[in-house]
Amino acid sequence: PDEYEKTVPQVFPTTAPGNFTWLPDIGHYVMTTFYPYQWDLNYANPVVFNEMVNNMLYLVNQGIDIVRIDAVPYIWKQLGTTCRNLPQVHTIVRMMRMITEIVCPGVLLLGEVVMEPEKVVPYFGTLEKPECHMLYNVTTMASTWHTVATKEVALLKQQMDVVNSLPKEYVFLNYLRCHDDIGWGLDYDFLKTSGIQEIPHKKYLNEYFRGMAAGSDARGELYNDDPVLQDARLCGTTASLCGLEASLQAKDPARIERAIQKILMLNAYL
């Protein structure tokens, strides 16, 4: 574990620090990238892959149409690396795609890749060797909320131009919010051309969506605030981030209507 910890970043440094959990009952460490109750699987063992495919096919036989592959970039481990986005991950996903196309061609694989824009698209594979059928449009989601907070559309337009330039076979699942937090994985190279720096901008976005900035009725909450890295994620429903929660508490009809219109606008845009 100590050797892995030298190169593997922590996902939840404040709520679940480290990448391993000691199990005294069996006298072993288990790799737990996310939370102690979420064990990482060793896909280097072919038995693990076979069992996971069996589980997938069992669900498909129950009538499941879309299978989500959770935290795709993390599923292969290699000492001396970040254990993120390794080439073997794409091999595994490609094998799963081949199996579904043969056994259950009507089923879609939905990949969860919550990372920077340039690291998301490779999980579609290529037109010749496809991997995931669909990916969450994480970057557009975060860019949309950036636009809500800043009233600036340049980043969102740039992001949509990137999406629209991809092959039509690449399908994104567009969404405003989900059960996960917002990690502000924006295109900071693009933002730097407008003089916007990553750390101060993340701080502003988190302040805006907690209702701490001028003109904001949002009521989001920080998640996994890391004072060392000066980074934090944000949690909140669409209604809360658009100001409906605060407006209802204030019993202000005008603010309630404004919040509802913002929610309708965002859903219409999607």
What are these model-derived regions, one by one?
Residues 1-270:
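Active-site and adjacent substrate-binding regions of carbohydrate-active enzymes
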